[in-house]
Amino acid sequence: MLFSLKISFLMMGLSGLTAQIVLLRELLVSFLGNELTLGIILANWLILVAIGSYLIGPSVERVERKLEVFVLLQLVFSVALPLSIFLCRTFKNILLLTPGEALGFAPIWVSSFLILLPVTLPYGALFTYGCKLYSQYSREEASSVGKVYLFETIGAIIGGLLLTFLLIQHLHSFEIALVISLAMGWVSLILVWPALNQRGSGPASRSLIPSFKSALWILSGLLCLIFAYSLLSQTSTLIHHFSLQTQWRNLNVIHNENSAYGNITVTKRGEQFTFYNDGVPSLTAPVPDIAFVENFVHFPMLFHEKPESLLILSGGAGGMIHEILKYPIKRVDYVELDPLLLKLVQKFPTPLTQSELSDKRVNIHYMDGRLYTQKTQDRFDILWIGLPAPQTLQTNRLFSLEFFFMAKRIMNPHGLLVLSLPGSLTYISPELRDLNGCILDTLKRVFASVRIIPGDVNLYLASSSEFLEKIPSDEIVTRFKERNIQTNLLTENYLKYRLQERWLQWYWKSMERRKSHINSDFLPLGVYFNLSYWNALFSPYLTGIFKGFEGLQLTLFLVIIILITVLLAILFIKMPRHSRHAVTYSIFTTGLTGMIFTLAIIFTFQTFYGYLYHQIGLLVAIFMAGIAFGSYLIIHPLNRMKEHSILYLKIEIGIILFAILLPFFFLIPSPHLENKTVFFVLYAGFLVTAFLSGMFTGLQFPLAVKIYLKQPSEKWKLGQTAGLIYGADLFGGFFGGLFGGVLFLPLLGLKKTCFMMAMIKISSGLLFLLFMRSKRT
């Protein structure tokens, strides 16, 4: 039975990590790819697991048939996982939302909470029941918690590696879920079988009453048959297509595929194709958005005296290139953020896209746009950023201060950088003002001249030459007549109307702000302001909260940390018996800092490389490997160790040093990513930092349980202690995910956030010192 339990714990970790990543990927598509929502999703995952651990887990001390409940929880998890994936794709229909519609903060939090609930509640209880069962069969107490933690973590590592390098490459989400569910059902059969055949008075025979153990075994076998049939009969594929069609209501989905950069869906209505990238429309053909395309292309072309060499970063196919080729240019280099999009455009051709991509002047590059900008030695007259706004960290890579410097390097002396942002000619809301102002301030930091053409879509033209602001509107109209370009919308009168001085004066008056904001790789304010803008549209009742967050400073958080530390210190000094809660507080802060470190590593990886969608499973698996390594190091000498508290304090100091050094590890090599050696060494560095971040958690968790159980005044049992410490870790991760992704990292930036984490661990270290002192007195 002990061997079967170990297999079960491995499967528990594997299935938990796999479920988490698959659901994360599905929810990211529903939330339009915004990585800041990762923190909200992870926070909900952790709080629900903690609730399961706290509410269901403590019943382990009262329930006689522990193995029975453990197996039932596994079966509930296996059934809930495919259901949750289906809900990820269809919940917008339930809420009467349209495909591609953005959500505010509150709907994102509530919907992800409810979708994850069926999976996470049983998963949270499995750990507590697993600890008790292992101690029951192994006759061990404190070390059993660490061993279950270790087996679960090893399973999570295996799951992350399998998911990243095998499952995602060949299976869709429902197939992955059914494979996991089948494995969980198989493990349930293994656990029930010994109890089914055993007679006597051992734990196995007592744990299951005869009538129920037979029914449980039959249920496990029946579910295994259902899962296996669904996989082998292609029922899973039918469910997959049905869920996609339901997700894209009233649209004919003809293709859906995941790439390293995200999810791309192609729909068709009549002869019109629409390509969606993570739920956001990227291009339409053969009839494009004529108004946007003509404005976005022709204004920059007319502002340049003689454009010949051009670069398009995303959004070129489906109209832009067609309009550009009306001019006597020499070459157009076209790069997409996701190369799969170009391949699908060629797979589903239209006369428009075929003529664009087959022209000899068009050079297509199947690589990441930012990486191309770093590596190319060519120079360009006009560079277009064909993305609507920095709504994700992936797109923010082309709107940051660092990227603008890269773009400036490859522009000719009178070259133009062109981008667009949401605008209005009637009313600019505070959120829209902040979004536009942030990108404008960033452009001005790099370029000598920035020309704005206000409208429902604001056009920004930036150049290192001051000639741009001196070009009169009459000159633009003259060039339009001389070049004799045939357009559908643009006319001489339209050009005069758009370039009237009154629009520019109105724009500058509407954009008056007290503070300048710079959008950078490590301080992605553009993403935050874009999230705030969408939140104002879809959750306006939270607008005041978002505006309040913008004014938060590191000093305020430091004051709060000091205040909490002082209050807890007074409590522990006045009431020494409560000082044991310093251990709980410490584990809470370790969970919080661990989540912040994980988000920092994930966000920075996305900023540098752009393909987090594919690699997130690997990064989380390496984090879990660190936990496993830390647990392994500490478990074996745990019972022989005498000075548990001193070692625990040393680990606290290690976390503090890690928090201080982490940002510099990323900041120092970041300007040199075009170098292949730096590129791959830094990639390995991400894996190392993820490993170290997990290792600190793995070292502390078993120690915390041991220290807590050693307290003579405590009468807590193993299951209660495991639930308490595990729950504290998860609650810390919850707060880290909730505030780290949408508050700390976007508003404070990487350096200040990591410094704040160091201060939090200094706080927990000082309180733990008080706990050590109280034990000696």
Predicted segments, located by residue:
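Alpha-helical transmembrane segments of multi-pass membrane proteins
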Residues: 1-469, 473-777
